[in-house]
Structure formats: structure tokens, C-alpha cells
Amino acid sequence: MTALTLTPGSATLEHLARIYFDESPVRLDPACRPAVEAAAARIRAAAAGDVPVYGVNTGFGKLASLKVAPQDTATLQRNLILSHCCGVGAPIPRRMARLMMVLKLLSLGRGASGVRWELITLLQEMLARDVTPVIPVQGSVGASGDLAPLAHMTAVIIGAGEAEYQGQRLPGAEALARAGLTPIALGPKEGLAFINGTQFSTAFALAGLFGAWRAATSSLVTAALSTDAIMGSTAPLQPEIHALRGHRGQIDAAARMRALLDGSEIRESHREGDTRVQDPYCIRCQPQVTGAAMDVLRQAAQTLEIEANAATDNPLVLAEADMIVSGGNFHAEPVGFAADLIALALSEIGAIAQRRVALMVDPTLSFDLPPFLTPKPGLNSGLMIAEVTTAALMSENKHLANPCVTDSTPTSANQEDHVSMAAHGAVRLGRMVENLHYILGVELLCAAQGIEFRAPLQTSTALQAAVARLRAEVPRLEEDRYMAPEIETAARLVGAGALLDVVGIDMGGLRP
């Protein structure tokens, strides 16, 4: 696979998605090297001087007023990394750790952190040779950066900590040695440059964003299937309605659903003479709800693309001013807000999908579909409890959607007295995406069953392809059977984007 050449400050969402999903190899554009080396020289000069510079010749956090002798700077940086390796919980997934490493490369490559090029080279080589630090999932409050997770990442660079190599979990030094790499002792400020930053939170937020967008676009397919299954009206999808409001997401969602339903015999069969005047909101207001969620995801995408390219270290080397200045770019508040927005979107997409499932299994609302979508109700319960499962998942996602960024607490002896909780906010997105996959998977099962009850009438060509994709792995439900594996299969199809692959319609992108 050809390596992606990333220019610090110019990495795109498309680059980051390739790194996350495909584990594309990466390298930094070597054109950034002069700026990196100039900043490192500026830090070395400061370390040799008498003027206190935070993290260069001082302690950290509440201990910033304590001066450190020049001969102790290497020990200072090593102690910083080891003392901050306080993460707990399960190791984060390998692909998440790799994305986190790439984000750190992008930040260091801006030439404002003061690290030597040798460290950037080692981090690149760890990625290339499949040395992945073992990073516990819990321990960051999102300011001063993702300290504990980034310390676990950096520990391997200095020959400490643990790493995975060729499927084995090994001491960091051994993993490097097996890969033909050598640890590097940290110089002035280099440990601080590695652990000050938002790369853990940003990696999880990006993964949540990518999963949420795929789920949101897949939900338009399941929504269109549900609409046809209950013989819903397409009148609320008319473009003039959405143009009068003007929101891009709503306009796009309506257009995609019109395209998905175009040519449906089921729709044409009740276009005239339908006694129902209006469908319930979960059918009629789908573009307004899902479209709004898609707009929110695009807003979060813009924030996270900026953050992925940011220098989030402290202090920063300001080259043009020839200054080293303490600031607060490590504070992950933008990431925290983005994660909360993604969580809200995930919750709402699942909430309206769950109502569509409830509509289809209820014979008083489904326009003549049998109870719980089984041919022999009473003897069989059909999809009764599958709908209950979606209610449980919807409720869990509503709870998880409560904002995290508002839950600040003072840390580090009140020196770090406002934090973002971005890490917690971003990590929960993975669980929410998984829950949404299950909700949409059950909707897919229900809607396909409902469509088949409308035979001999056919749905649209695009939606027939979606049903056929499901039926390639899950047969029609005729009698009650063990359902759990089939829900897993349907959720997997949603999560993998399989529905998007077969409908033949461009579902749009995240670009704002």
C-alpha cells in the first residue's frame, strides 16, 4: 500500500479516514523538517540559559516555579513520562492507537514544539514497522492535554511501557528491538511536547464521527425501506418544502430519500385514494430530523479537521517572534464540544429509527402489515422482542448523549482548574455508534420483512438491492427462530456500509 504523505497543517478528513479504516502507512512531508529543527535548536538554547521556561528547565503543573538544573533536564523529561503513565482500563484498539500516533506526528510537524527530528522519525518507524503502544482507555480529563494516554504512547519511545508487535504484547524496549528500532533519550521539553496535546481525544472523536456519518447515511436507506413497508407518503419529500427552509442537511436527506424510493410500485399503488391524510412524524419528518443530525456532524467534522492539524503543545515556539510562550492549546474544549454534538446526532438518529421500528410491528399503525411482522401471529411472536431491544438501545444512547464538556473538575492542586472531559466524551461515541448499528440493523430486518409482505408489488430498484443484500445472509422470517445472530449480521451490514454499496446512489460526504 502506498504511503500517504501528510503535510502538517493540511491533513484532510479523507486522509484521516483512510488511516483509521485502512491503516494506510504514513510519512510526514520532509519539507517540514527545517522548521522542526529550528524550534528544537531554540529549545536547546533556552535549556542552557538562566531564564525559567516552563517544562524546559522547570517542574510541571503546580511545580512550575521550581527550577531544574541543566544537567538534570534528561532525567526531568524521563521522570515526566514515567510518572504520567497512570492510565487504567482496557487497552484502546490498535487502529485507534495508530490514529493517535499520526495525529501526534501532525502536531509535532508544525515546528512549534521543539522536538528533534529523530523523535519524529522514530514515531514514523514505529507506525511503519507495526509497533503499537499499549494505551489504557481511562485517565484523561482533556486538559492539560491527554496526559496519561500520551505518556503511555511516549513510554515506548524511551524504551519503557508496553507495545504490541506482530500480535504479541511486549515490554516497550523489547518491541522496539524486535522491530529493529532503538529507544531515544528525551532532551529538553521533548517529553512535555509528546504528552501535552489532544491526540487521544481527537482520535476517538474522529472515529466516532466516521462511524456516525456512515450510520446516518445508512439510516436514510433503512428509513426509505420503512417508508415503503408501511406504505408511507413521499409527498413530504418534495424539494420545494425543504428549499423553503434552507438547511443543507434537510435538503440533502430529502433528495436521497426521493432517489431511493424512485420507481417503487408500492408507492404508486396508494398515491391516489389513500384515506390517510398525514403519516406520523417518524415518517413525515425524516429529512428534518436526520438532515439536522447530518448538519451537526458536518459542523463537528470542521472542528475536528482543524484540531487534527493543530499544534496543541505548551509552551510553543513562536518562530517569527523568536519566543517560547506558555499558552493553553492543550485544552480540548473544541474536541469536547464536537464529541457532544456527535453524541446528540447519534441519539436522535437512533430515536427516530426506533419509532419507525415500533410503527412497523404495530398492526394498528402499519397499514395492514401483520402483528410483529410474522405470517402466523399468536403461534409466533415474530419481531416483537427485536423491537424491545431497539427501545433498550435507544434509551441507553439517550443517556450517553448527556453532555460531557460541562462536567469540569479542578485537578493538579487547582493549577489545572478547568478541564474539558473531551476524552470521556469522545470514548463513549464508540458504544453509541455500535448501539445505533443494532437499532438500524433491526429496522433493516423489519423493513425488509414488511416490503416482502407487499408482494406482488415491488419496491424501487435501489431498495430491492438493499433487501437482496440482507437476504444473502438472513432469510425471510416465516417461523420463530433464534434471532440474536441475525441481528448481529444486520448490524454488521449497516456498520460496514454494505447498504450504501448496493443502492447505487451517492449519499454525500462530510465536507461542510
Swiss-Prot record:
Offer an example of a GO molecular function term for this protein: histidine ammonia-lyase activity
Show the Pfam families listed in the entry.
Answer: Lyase_aromatic (PF00221)
Q: Which UniProt keywords apply?
A: Cytoplasm, Histidine metabolism, Lyase
Q: How is it modified after translation?
A: Contains an active site 4-methylidene-imidazol-5-one (MIO), which is formed autocatalytically by cyclization and dehydration of residues Ala-Ser-Gly.
Question: Which Gene3D superfamilies does the record associate with it?
Answer: Fumarase/aspartase (Central domain) (1.20.200.10), Fumarase/aspartase (N-terminal domain) (1.10.275.10)
Which EC number applies? 4.3.1.3
Cellular compartments per GO CC: cytoplasm
Location of 2,3-didehydroalanine (Ser) modifications:
144
- Coiled-coil intervals: none
Pathways per UniProt: Amino-acid degradation; L-histidine degradation into L-glutamate; N-formimidoyl-L-glutamate from L-histidine: step 1/3
For this protein, the record's NCBIfam families field holds: hutH, PRK09367.1
Q: What is this protein called?
A: Histidine ammonia-lyase
| Organism, scientific name | Ruegeria pomeroyi (strain ATCC 700808 / DSM 15171 / DSS-3) (Silicibacter pomeroyi)
Q: Gene that codes for this?
A: hutH
